[in-house]
Amino acid sequence: MSVSQNTETPGAPAPARQSGSGVGRVLVAVYAVLAIAATGRSVFQIIDRFHEAPVAFVLSASAGAIYVVATIALGARLRRLALITISIELAGVLVVGTLSLLAPALLGLHSLDPFGRDSTVWSAYGAGYLLVPLVLPVLGLLYLRGGSARRVTG
């Protein structure tokens, strides 16, 4: 019997969760979609009208980069990198979301509209993306926490 099949032996490593199934697969897929959406949006905004809201557009590009790294980290089961990236993501959503509502001028936003021309991925806590940017890092951290309790790496 191989070590990966022997789950009864005390002290034996727990079997790793399959990366291609279950909640992990859905989480990676949602992160991938958000990575593409955020990166595409920010590239367009930077090329088309960077002068209108440079801070907001750089924040959108940063969000896109964070989603790309989180997608790769979750897919490759790089738990520590995923934990760091998703924690930064949550902090970014909370800080940018709050600033976009309380002090939009600090971000270079001209309106509170989360669907506006100069809004970021994280404006109004991601309301322009149906609040997925607010919920996703919480789900990601819970997923990683659950994995660590069972000695799972991803």
Model-derived features with residue positions:
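Cytosolic juxtamembrane helix and N-cap/initiation of the first transmembrane helix
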Residues: 2-34
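Transmembrane alpha-helix entry/boundary detector in multi-pass membrane proteins
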Residues: 23-27, 42-64
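Core segments of alpha-helical transmembrane spans in multipass integral membrane proteins
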Residues: 32-40, 56-75, 91, 128
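Membrane-interface interhelical loops and short amphipathic "cap" helices
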Residues: 40-53, 108-120
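Loop-to-transmembrane helix junctions at the membrane interface
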Residues: 72-99
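C-terminal halves and exits of single transmembrane alpha-helices
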Residues: 90-120
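Individual transmembrane alpha-helices with interfacial aromatic-anchor signatures
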Residues: 116-139
